[in-house]
Design a protein with these regions (language model features):
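Conserved structural position within tetratricopeptide repeats
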Residues: 13-16, 47-50, 81-84, 115-118, ...
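Register position in tetratricopeptide repeats
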Residues: 34-35, 68, 102-103, 129, ...
C-alpha cells in the first residue's frame, strides 16, 4: 500500500468512528488534493469548515486546492479569511502571494512573499516564489539573491 492509500485508509477509519472530526476531514482532503482528487478535497474541506468556520488550516487548505485548480477568486477569498484568522500563517500568506503572481499582481505578490518570509524565514518555497516574481519583473539581482537563499534552505524544505 502506498503512503497516500495508507493515509486515506487511516483517515477513513477515524471518520467512520466520528464523521465530525475536523482534523481528519482536513487531513483526508490533503490526501485527496495530493492525488489530484480536487472535488473530493473540496468536499472534505467544505465539511470541515462547516463544522468549524474558524479553522484557518482547513480554510487555507481549501484555498490551496482552489489555487491548484486556477480558481483565483475563490483561492484569494479563502486565503484572505485564513490570514484574517491567523495573521502569522506563513503558508497561507505565501499561498495568497502565489495567486497574486498567477494573475499578474506582482506588487501584491512581492509584498505577500516578503511578509511570509518575515513570518517564517525557513521556508525555501516562499523565497523561491519571491525570486520568481523578481525574475518576472526583471529584477535579476534580487531574484538571484532569493534563489541562492532558497537553495541554502532546500534540504529542509521539500517544496522549494
Amino acid at each position: 500500500m502506498d503512503e497516500y492509500a495508507e493515509a486515506l485508509a487511516g483517515f477513513n477509519r477515524v471518520l467512520a468512528l466520528n464523521p465530525a472530526q475536523v482534523w481528519a476531514l482536513a487531513g483526508r482532503a490533503v490526501v485527496y488534493r495530493a492525488t489530484g482528487r480536487y472535488a473530493d478535497a473540496l468536499a472534505d474541506f467544505n465539511r470541515a469548515i462547516e463544522l468549524d468556520s474558524g479553522d484557518a488550516v482547513a480554510i487555507a487548505g481549501r484555498a490551496e486546492t482552489h489555487r491548484l485548480m486556477d480558481h483565483h477568486a475563490e483561492a484569494l477569498a479563502d486565503f484572505d479569511r485564513a490570514i484574517e484568522i491567523d495573521p502569522s500563517n506563513a503558508w497561507a500568506i505565501g499561498g495568497r502571494a502565489q495567486v497574486y503572481q498567477a494573475i499578474g499582481r506582482y506588487e501584491e505578490a512581492l509584498a505577500g512573499f516578503t511578509r511570509a518570509i518575515d513570518a517564517d524565514p525557513t521556508q525555501a518555497w516562499v523565497l523561491a516564489g519571491r525570486g520568481r516574481v523578481y525574475k518576472e519583473i526583471g529584477m535579476y539581482d534580487k531574484a538571484i539573491e532569493d534563489f541562492t537563499r532558497a537553495i541554502g534552505l532546500e534540504d529542509s524544505d521539500p517544496y522549494a
